[in-house]
Amino acid sequence: MKDLAKKLGANIRAKRKEKGLAQDKFAELADLDRSYVGRIERGETNITVDKLYILTQVLGCHARDLLP
């Protein structure tokens, strides 16, 4: 399960960078704490479907684009 979280986090980070968003701006747009976004991107935490949906809205993509 930990490996899945790391892959998902890496995909979120890659998509965020592709969109040209700094982590702090991304966190602000998603209404999440920047440190929490960092933990997500490093695969240190499992996120809920609700949080994944919020992140996809900010990134302008579908969840399937982020899931490994």
Language-model segments: what does each one mean?
Residues 48-65:
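DNA major-groove recognition helix of helix-turn-helix/homeodomain DNA-binding modules
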Residues 13, 24, 53:
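Residues within the helices of the helix-turn-helix
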Residues 20-39:
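Short alpha-helical DNA-recognition segment
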Residues 17, 28, 57:
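Alpha-helical residues within the helix-turn-helix
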Residues 1-17:
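A short, Lys/Arg-rich alpha-helix, primarily the initiator
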Residues 3, 42, 68:
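Short, conserved catalytic or interaction motifs in soluble domains
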